[in-house]
């Protein structure tokens, strides 16, 4: 199985986590999984989003790699240069492929490059994905949004996410020397994550922000009473999740939010808006605290039983993620 992606380590985000964990499960099951990633090419940082590196000199090298690997199935995970060239090679050589939709880049463009018409991005995304045999999307809510921008509903498959990886399986609590309750945010510190909505909430206790990004310096200066810890990973991150009272997820642009399932695996209740991603995760559950008012959502979450979070988290596994992925690939032999 070949996965072509513009997002992979050392990037830290939900796309990378999904592709890596899916591959790990498939490898354990005896499948051979290969990746075409940016580390195989010359790259430069994406303007206004430096963590993402744009690959150059990808054609005809992507085609040569596909030819050399001779995969039984090809999955194109991103719409960047690597994904675009892998798609082009497949179409040119009449090879079947699947794609997945991880990021609403049309919405990101509106935030970062408002001069570019959103319709252009929507048209590009629809054209990119509609040539695939199947399109894996994060949630049912996202499927409905993507129908509106022209993506073929008949090809879309809901592809859920896990959260039960590494240190998140059994996190160790630590003593955080801050006034309770402790409200934690984990993720990229950038405009599309809507962190300001969390920082402006009038909440008793302590707000902790974990992550890095272009808005970090500005927000630290603007909110000096809040605690900014920078980036943390693996056991240290899981311990901060487990030792906080509520995880606040203010994003309105994420297509799922793996940090949500990671928090639940640590027994930490979640406050969020009722938008695609959180809405799909919590629908019908007794730990659903979503509200259009983030402060109200946070106060509801504070009353949630942590054991209920741990129990609910069991339904989100990478084994299920890998199963859906494998069941929907399109073999070329």
PLM segments and residue spans:
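Nucleotide-activated donor-binding/catalytic signature segment of Leloir-type glycosyltransferases, i.e.
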Residues: 217-236
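Aromatic "clamp/platform" in nucleotide-sugar-dependent glycosyltransferases that forms part
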Residues: 252
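Carbohydrate-associated surface elements
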Residues: 39, 141, 161-162
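Short hydrophobic beta-strand element within catalytic cores of glycosyltransferases
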Residues: 265, 269-272
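A charged, aromatic-enriched C-terminal amphipathic alpha-helix characteristic of glycosyltransferases
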Residues: 302-331
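Acidic anion/phosphate-binding donor-loop and adjacent secondary structure
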Residues: 147, 163-179
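Conserved donor-binding/catalytic core segment of Leloir-type glycosyltransferases
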Residues: 175-208
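Short alpha-helical donor nucleotide-sugar binding micro-motif in glycosyltransferases
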Residues: 129, 231-232, 239-244, 325
């Amino acid at each position: 199985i070949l996965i072509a992606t513009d997002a992979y380590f050392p990037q830290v985000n939900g796309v990378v986590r999904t592709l890596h964990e899916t591959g790990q499960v498939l490898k354990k099951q005896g499948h051979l999984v290969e990746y075409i990633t940016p580390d195989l090419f010359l790259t430069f940082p994406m303007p206004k989003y430096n963590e993402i590196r744009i690959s150059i000199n990808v054609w005809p090298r992507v085609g040569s790699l596909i030819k050399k690997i001779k995969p039984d199935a090809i999955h194109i995970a991103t719409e960047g240069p690597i994904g675009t060239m892998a798609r082009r090679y497949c179409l040119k050589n009449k090879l079947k492929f699947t794609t997945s939709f991880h990021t609403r880049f049309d919405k990101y463009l509106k935030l970062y490059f408002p001069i570019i018409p959103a319709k252009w991005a929507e048209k590009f995304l629809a054209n990119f994905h509609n040539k695939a045999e199947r399109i894996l999307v994060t949630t049912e809510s996202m499927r409905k949004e993507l129908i509106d921008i022209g993506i073929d509903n008949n090809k879309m498959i809901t592809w859920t996410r896990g959260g039960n990886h590494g240190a998140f399986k059994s996190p160790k609590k630590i003593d955080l020397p801050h006034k309770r309750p402790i409200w934690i945010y984990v993720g990229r510190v950038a405009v599309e994550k809507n962190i300001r909505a969390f920082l402006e909430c009038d909440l008793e206790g302590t707000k902790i922000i974990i992550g890095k990004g272009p808005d970090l310096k500005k927000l630290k200066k603007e909110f000096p009473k809040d605690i900014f810890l920078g980036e943390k990973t693996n056991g240290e991150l899981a311990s901060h999740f487990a030792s906080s009272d509520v995880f606040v997820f203010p994003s309105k642009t994420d297509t799922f939010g793996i940090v949500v399932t990671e928090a639940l695996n640590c027994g930490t209740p979640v406050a969020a808006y009722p938008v695609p991603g959180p809405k799909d995760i919590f629908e019908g559950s007794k730990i659903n605290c979503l509200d259009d008012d983030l402060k109200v959502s946070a106060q509801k979450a504070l009353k949630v039983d942590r054991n209920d979070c741990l129990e609910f988290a069991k339904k989100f596994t990478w084994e299920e993620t890998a199963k859906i992925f494998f069941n929907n690939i399109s073999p070329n032999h």
